[in-house]
């Protein structure tokens, strides 16, 4: 975190800014009124009490639906976003259930002052690796003309994996390839039917200089206890947090039974 600055993430209480929300065929509000006090990151002076978003706070970035996975690394703020849901349910003439299972991406963003990441007007598509206009704003699953000014992600992960934490590895215990890269905990999906549910893992994204240097890899897996997993409630464990120990070990927490694992490298 920058000196004397506190960054606060404020998620959006909405799927795609419809009114009423999550209804078949309802267009999105344009402009979306939620962007005034939601769907973004605000910065505050940590030495001043009594601040609000309007008085003392400054909006740092916008266009982020939900972003519990947020961290500061090497002078920049990184976020992994929960993207929108249920494309097929609300727009069945445009998207199939399989479309919804594979899109949109859960994107990793690098935020700077004034960044706009596109929600609710656009989503970053995992199969196409580009922004598309949301159907609530006239999108047909192919067009992204409205999205030209939005900031593209550093990396993208499969649909509905539900990122909940991100930590950049700064230790020396693990092999050199992990240094400076990001570990991301995914809580796992609930709406990928008819495909099996997915996520429920910790991935590693190689990074250097604020950019991805390769594809992500699954670092820790097997939390569900069964495969395929069709019902999220049947998962034995769901990753929910990551921490790095002073000795360079990695701690992974889960939410089903409150377990914590310690991951150490022994050279074997």
Short names for language-model regions:
Residues 4-55, 62-66, 70-233, 237, ...:
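Beta-propeller domain segments
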Residues 241-268:
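Blade-level signature of beta-propeller repeat domains, shared across WD40, Kelch, NHL, RCC1
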């Amino acid at each position: 975190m920058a000196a004397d600055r506190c960054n606060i993430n404020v998620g959006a209480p909405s799927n795609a800014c419809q009114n009423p929300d999550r209804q078949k065929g309802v267009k999105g509000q344009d402009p979306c009124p939620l962007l005034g006090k939601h769907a973004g990151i605000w910065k505050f002076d940590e030495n001043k009490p009594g601040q609000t978003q309007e008085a003392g706070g400054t909006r740092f970035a916008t266009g982020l639906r939900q972003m519990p996975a947020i961290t500061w690394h090497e002078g920049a703020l990184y976020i992994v976003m929960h993207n929108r849901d249920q494309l097929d349910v609300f727009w069945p003439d445009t998207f199939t259930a399989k479309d919804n299972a594979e899109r949109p991406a859960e994107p990793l963003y690098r935020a700077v002052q004034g960044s706009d990441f596109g929600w609710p007007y656009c989503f970053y598509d995992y199969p196409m690796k580009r922004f598309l206009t949301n159907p609530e704003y006239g999108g047909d699953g192919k067009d992204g003309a409205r999205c030209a000014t939005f900031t593209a992600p550093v990396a993208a992960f499969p649909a509905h994996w539900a990122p909940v934490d991100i930590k950049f590895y700064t230790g020396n215990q693990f092999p050199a390839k992990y240094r400076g890269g990001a570990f991301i905990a995914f809580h796992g999906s609930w709406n990928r039917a008819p495909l099996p549910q997915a996520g429920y893992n910790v991935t590693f994204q190689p990074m250097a200089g604020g950019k991805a240097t390769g594809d992500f890899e699954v670092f820790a897996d097997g939390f569900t206890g069964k495969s395929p997993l069709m019902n999220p409630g049947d998962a034995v464990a769901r990753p929910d947090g990551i921490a790095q120990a002073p000795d360079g070990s990695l701690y992974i927490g889960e939410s089903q039974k409150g377990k914590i694992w310690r991951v150490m490298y022994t050279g074997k």
